[in-house]
C-alpha cells in the first residue's frame, strides 16, 4: 500500500479506504469518508486507531462514487470520536433519488443519543469462526480476557454452519460485479490496474450466471436470517 500507517510505517494501514483512516489518525483532517465492499472501513479504522462507522446498507448515498459492487458497496465515515462520526453521518444519511439503494432513516437525534451514553448494558455476541486458529496467540488471549472479565455482557455462540460459506459467496459477488463495472478499463489498458485487481477481474469474468445467482440468493437469505 502507498498509504502508510501513521503509528508505524512498517505496518499496513488496513485496506482500500486506508487513506481516509490515515488522514484522521495523522491529524491531517478531523473527518473523512470511505467506502466498504469487504471490510474497507472498519478494518482501516481499527488498524489506524480511529473511529470508523459503516452504517447499514442504503443509509448513505453512493452517488458519485466509483462503483465496485452495487450489492455490497456501502459508504462509511471516520473520525476521532463517536460524536464526531455521528455529526458527519447525520449530515450524510438521507434518501437520494440518484441512488435507488438508499432508504429513509430519521438520523436527527444521532448526536443527542451519543451524548446520553448507553441506556442499558450493552450485549455482545462472540463467534469463534474456523479462522480462530489462524489468529496469533496474543490476540486470542486478549479476546479470551474480555470474554472472561465481561461475561455478563458477552454471549459465546457456536458459529452457524452457513458462516463458512460467506467468504466464498462474497468473493463471487465482489469479483463478478467488479469485472462488470471495471471491464471498460480492463479492456482499454489492463496494465494501469493493479495486479490484484486484474486477477480479481479475470476470475470474475469466468463465473457462470448460476454461480452468481446462487451467491445472490445466499446473500439475501443471510440478510433475512
Provide a role label for each language-model segment:
Residues 153-170, 201-202:
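Short connector loops at secondary-structure junctions
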Residues 1-92:
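Short glycine/serine-rich loop segments
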Residues 118-127, 169-223:
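Short helix-loop capping/hinge segments that flank enzyme active sites or metal/cofactor-binding pockets
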Residues 137-160, 182-188, 212, 216-225:
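Acyltransferase
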Residues 54-140:
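A short helix-breaking turn/cap at a secondary-structure junction
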Residues 8-12, 102-103, 212-219:
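Short, flexible loop segments at the rims of nucleotide/cofactor-binding pockets, characterized by
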Residues 18, 35, 45-48, 80-87, ...:
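Conserved active-site and cofactor/substrate-binding residues in soluble primary-metabolism enzymes
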Amino acid at each position: 500500500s502507498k498509504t502508510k500507517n501513521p503509528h508505524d510505517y512498517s505496518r499496513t494501514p488496513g485496506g482500500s479506504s486506508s487513506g481516509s483512516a490515515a488522514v484522521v489518525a495523522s491529524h491531517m483532517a478531523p473527518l473523512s469518508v470511505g467506502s466498504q465492499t469487504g471490510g474497507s472501513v472498519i478494518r482501516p479504522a481499527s488498524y489506524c486507531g480511529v473511529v470508523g462507522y459503516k452504517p447499514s446498507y442504503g443509509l448513505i448515498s453512493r452517488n458519485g462514487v466509483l462503483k465496485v459492487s452495487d450489492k455490497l458497496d456501502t459508504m462509511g465515515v471516520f473520525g476521532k470520536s463517536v460524536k464526531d462520526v455521528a455529526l458527519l453521518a447525520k449530515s450524510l444519511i438521507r434518501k437520494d433519488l440518484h441512488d435507488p439503494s438508499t432508504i429513509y432513516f430519521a438520523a436527527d437525534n444521532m448526536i443527542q443519543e451519543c451524548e446520553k451514553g448507553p441506556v442499558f448494558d450493552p450485549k455482545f455476541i462472540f463467534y469463534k469462526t474456523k479462522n480462530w486458529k489462524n489468529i496469533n496467540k496474543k490476540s486470542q488471549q486478549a479476546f479470551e480476557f474480555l470474554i472472561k472479565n465481561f461475561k455478563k455482557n458477552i454471549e459465546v455462540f457456536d458459529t452457524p454452519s452457513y458462516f463458512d460459506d460467506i467468504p466464498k459467496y462474497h468473493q463471487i459477488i465482489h469479483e463478478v460485479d467488479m469485472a462488470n463495472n471495471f471491464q471498460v478499463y480492463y479492456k482499454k489498458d489492463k496494465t494501469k490496474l493493479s495486479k490484484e485487481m486484474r486477477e480479481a477481474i479475470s476470475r470474475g469474468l469466468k463465473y457462470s450466471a448460476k454461480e452468481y445467482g446462487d451467491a445472490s440468493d445466499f446473500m439475501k437469505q443471510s440478510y433475512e436470517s
